[in-house]
């Protein structure tokens, strides 16, 4: 039997294609490790108009070509900020053919009224948005709420809690809210921010800037972000090492008696109640 050979050279993947593949690999790694997508799911994809949430939506749209047994609905909260371009997302989502809902809620006025001069607005804004999104999730009957936090968000939150709250706590990839009504997932937790930024430029997403808090300088989150960036420059791959540490915990070498029984010298086997306490400057992108 004769074999047919070809001298045709297959083109190498472009940098953009390599980046897309890395993002999809990271997305699926989180999905598989934490069971973020299950048969019959109806997932509410929270869309702010920023690079992270646009990328998350794209990942879910692609995921539906692989798994066809779940639904998505994109939800945007219009907080009635001045000069907010409210036409952009409906036009974009209609063009994509994605099922969506725009929720109009004037949280902007509340944040402006309640935040003292010189203080950052992130915490209150986040709580108000979270409440509105949870109410919308209940109304729509979704099984999961998807948020677009990425790897750097997780690391920054870990150090913010460590430095300013005295807690070793980051952002879970999946958790249930205190009232037991909602499951929240973060499918981008393994995705790197710079890869998301590159993807956003490549896809030419119609980015909507946050004029409420984006102009606030000297926030602790920005300082922490710079600290991590400086570490990465001085010690390449430092962020990856720290991130891996979040998956490699030794309770017996810390001091939390809920995690380790120091009297009997054994790990706790009973399920711990999740402490879903507010995070330092946590936000929904």
Swiss-Prot record:
EC numbers, comma separated: 2.8.1.-
Catalytic activity: cytidine(32) in tRNA + S-sulfanyl-L-cysteinyl-[cysteine desulfurase] + AH2 + ATP = 2-thiocytidine(32) in tRNA + L-cysteinyl-[cysteine desulfurase] + A + AMP + diphosphate + H(+)
Residues annotated to bind [4Fe-4S] cluster: 122, 125, 213
Highest taxon above the source species: Bacteria
InterPro entries: Rossmann-like_a/b/a_fold (IPR014729), TilS/TtcA_N (IPR011063), tRNA_Cyd_32_2_STrfase (IPR012089), tRNA_thiolation_TtcA_Ctu1 (IPR035107)
Top-tier EC class: transferase
Keywords: 4Fe-4S, ATP-binding, Cytoplasm, Iron, Iron-sulfur, Magnesium, Metal-binding, Nucleotide-binding, RNA-binding, Transferase, tRNA processing, tRNA-binding
Cellular compartments per GO CC: cytoplasm
Short motif PP-loop motif, span: 48-53
Keyword Thylakoid: no
Single Gene Ontology BP annotation: tRNA thio-modification
Compartmental location: Cytoplasm
Cofactor note: Binds 1 [4Fe-4S] cluster per subunit. The cluster is chelated by three Cys residues, the fourth Fe has a free coordination site that may bind a sulfur atom transferred from the persulfide of IscS.
Cofactor names: Mg(2+); [4Fe-4S] cluster
Metabolic or biological pathway: tRNA modification
Pfam families: ATP_bind_3
Entry's Gene Ontology molecular function annotations: 4 iron, 4 sulfur cluster binding; ATP binding; magnesium ion binding; sulfurtransferase activity; tRNA binding
Family: Belongs to the TtcA family.
Function, as annotated: Catalyzes the ATP-dependent 2-thiolation of cytidine in position 32 of tRNA, to form 2-thiocytidine (s(2)C32). The sulfur atoms are provided by the cysteine/cysteine desulfurase (IscS) system.
Note: The thiolation reaction likely consists of two steps: a first activation step by ATP to form an adenylated intermediate of the target base of tRNA, and a second nucleophilic substitution step of the sulfur (S) atom supplied by the hydrosulfide attached to the Fe-S cluster.
Subunit structure: Homodimer.
PANTHER family: AMINOTRAN_5 DOMAIN-CONTAINING PROTEIN, SULFURTRANSFERASE-RELATED
Annotated protein name in UniProt: tRNA-cytidine(32) 2-sulfurtransferase
The species this protein was found in: Cytophaga hutchinsonii (strain ATCC 33406 / DSM 1761 / CIP 103989 / NBRC 15051 / NCIMB 9469 / D465)
Taxonomy of the source species: Bacteria, Pseudomonadati, Bacteroidota, Cytophagia, Cytophagales
């Amino acid at each position: 039997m004769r074999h047919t050979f070809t001298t045709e050279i297959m083109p190498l993947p472009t940098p953009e294609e390599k980046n897309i593949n890395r993002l999809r690999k990271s997305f699926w790694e989180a999905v598989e490790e934490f069971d973020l997508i299950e048969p019959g799911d109806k997932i509410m994809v929270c869309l702010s108009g920023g690079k992270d949430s646009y990328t998350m939506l794209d990942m879910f749209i692609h995921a539906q070509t692989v798994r066809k047994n779940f639904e998505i609905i994109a939800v945007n909260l219009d907080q009635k900020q001045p000069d907010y371009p409210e036409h952009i997302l409906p036009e974009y989502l209609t063009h994509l053919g994605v099922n969506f809902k725009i929720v109009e809620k004037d949280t902007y006025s509340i944040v402006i009224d309640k935040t003292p001069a010189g203080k950052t607005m992130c915490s209150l804004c986040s709580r108000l948005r979270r409440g509105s999104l949870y109410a919308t999730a209940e109304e729509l009957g979704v099984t999961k709420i998807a948020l677009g936090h990425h790897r750097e968000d997780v690391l920054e939150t870990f150090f913010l809690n460590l430095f300013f709250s005295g807690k070793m706590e980051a952002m879970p990839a999946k958790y249930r809210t205190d009232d037991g009504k909602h499951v929240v997932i973060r499918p981008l937790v393994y995705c790197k921010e710079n890869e998301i930024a590159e993807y956003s430029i490549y896809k030419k997403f119609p980015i909507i800037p946050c004029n409420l808090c984006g102009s606030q300088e000297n926030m602790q989150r920005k300082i922490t972000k710079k600290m991590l960036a400086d570490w990465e420059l001085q010690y390449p791959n430092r962020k990856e090492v720290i991130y891996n540490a979040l998956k490699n915990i030794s309770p017996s070498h810390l001091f939390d008696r809920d995690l380790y029984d120091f009297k009997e010298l054994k790990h706790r086997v009973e399920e711990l109640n999740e402490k879903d306490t507010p995070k330092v400057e946590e936000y929904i992108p």
